[in-house]
Amino acid sequence: MKINNLLLIGTFFFILCCFPFIELQANELKPTDTIEYFDDGSYYEITLQEDLNIFRSSTKNGSKTVTYKSANGTTLWSVTVHGSFYFNGTSAKCTNSTVSTTCPASTWKITSASSSKSGASASATATAKQYISGKLSQTKTKTVTLQCSSSGKLS
């Protein structure tokens, strides 16, 4: 009986001690979107996604995606920068930057994609080309940048 009570008390104190380190913020799971329109009605949809971090820490991971869509909302292609950051309240630093792309539209092709990091920023650049009847119709190059503040806020 005493061992069970000690185990119960020990478990209670363990949970009590660890609870302040748990950081469950539902708003971190919701992406934030902005839109940039072109004259022909097509647009870039820009989405910021912050990865959930259940323990308070000085690291932050997230991604920023630019999706190019037609005037009717069809996704043509996208480029995403994935960034990892370290922050300490006075400064921030990007520790890793990677790029990923998608191209579901048959008339578009991603011809190049690269990523880089500098200071507290992670960047990715992609070039997409549209071919109609085998001929180049248009080219779009887009750079997306993910930044981290000294307090760990991604933008």
Regions found by a protein language model. Give the residues of each.
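Mature secreted bioactive peptide module from preproproteins
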Residues: 53-155
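N-terminal prepro-regions of secreted/extracellular proteins
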Residues: 1-73
